[in-house]
Amino acid sequence: MKRFIGNKDFYKLVAALALPLLLQNAVSTFVNLLDNLMVGRIGTESMSGVSIVNQLLFVYNLCLFGGSGGAGIFGAQFFGRGDHAGIRHTLRFNILLCTGFTVLATVLLALIPDTLIGAFLHEAGTGGDLALTLAEGKDYLRIMLFGLPAFCLTTAYVSILRVTGDNRLPMKASIAAIFVNLVFNYLLIYGKFGFPMLGVRGAAIATVLSRYVEFGLILLGTHGRKNPPEYIRGLYRGFSIPGHLAGQIVRKGMPLLVNEMFWSLGMTMLTQCYSYRGLDAIAALNINSTVLNLFNTVIFTMGNTVGIVIGNLLGAEEYDRARDYCPKLAALSCTASAAVGVVLFLIAPYAPRLYNTSHEIMTLAASLMRICAIMLPVHAVTNAAYWTIRAGGRTYITMLSDSVFTWVVSVTIAWVLIHKTGLPLVEAYLFVNLAELIKMAIGIILLRRGIWVRNIVTGEEIAAGSKGN
């Protein structure tokens, strides 16, 4: 048991990193829940249209996350070594890469919205106005595109701020943006205090405003402070990046980018498969994912913490300490997720009642929530394994165990059950989630083998049984 329980210094380190992230993520997801509830009060079609668009934007978001994460791996290890020039170059790389993705995403989403949204609309279940759902989704998407530039630059900055230990600025900027989003959602969705009643368009406008508030605060907090971080100085004097470093980031980061892109596409394909069970399925999945995200903040926060802690230790060549912390971080993540899983299981029958939708959709959503509640500890372990292996630069392995697994196993199971059997949504969803047990077993094996113990900046690899510095 000692392998899984840390000392006071361990928990102090984790708390210092995790608590600001947890607060930011919890507040953000809670307000997203309120945002979703406000749209959900308009009606099932509006809620479903917005949900489909957010699923499409999810792919874009994960591409940014994967692209910036590749540079972030180097940023974490550069920070561990005290190399400010290296961090500056990784931030430049992030800005250029995220900008490129944003241009591509904007063009694609603007050109074929009917095709993309329509792929999720199928006649089944108790019905629903598919034409209205499509119209609401297009209205929402058209406005959301204006917020992508701010979101892209925020992502580029925040990924580096976090790996250098500056969690407070992103947290403060995020909370301010959340407040703006919540206030303008209320004013513009329902037309309060003299503002026009814009429905889903109001929700989109509020989100876009919040994106620019967040980016403005991030920019002011990094460049406008009296003593900006050393790596910020001279950031925009040029955009040159050493060729060997750019090549390293591309080689190590490309699998991570491809992984995030194909994983997000895989998750979108899962939703598309489930959508053949009708608009009720889309609505129930939206309610489930929105409530689940509030509880997933523990998993996401611990994952980021694992990546930062392990990445910094590997960069500082403290390999034995990294090995010691690995099982402790995974155990802490699993325990915390099990605790919140119990809460989710208990509230599952009541949370869907907050939405203005049918009893059938509420029942479906409650069943999906209970499946997710039971599986939370499993997801926590696989997530901790993913971030540990990623911190060591083993991005090809994370790609195989994450996105390839999603397509080969999860999507295949969902497609067969939905298209080749008459299995209801809940049973199909259960079988797809049970496949996560296979991924957890693979992750544990990879962690125990110690293949992640390596310094990607120096290229040093440490044998599984050897001693580090």
Predicted regions and their residues:
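N-terminal transmembrane alpha-helices
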Residues: 5-37, 41-42, 58-70, 74, ...
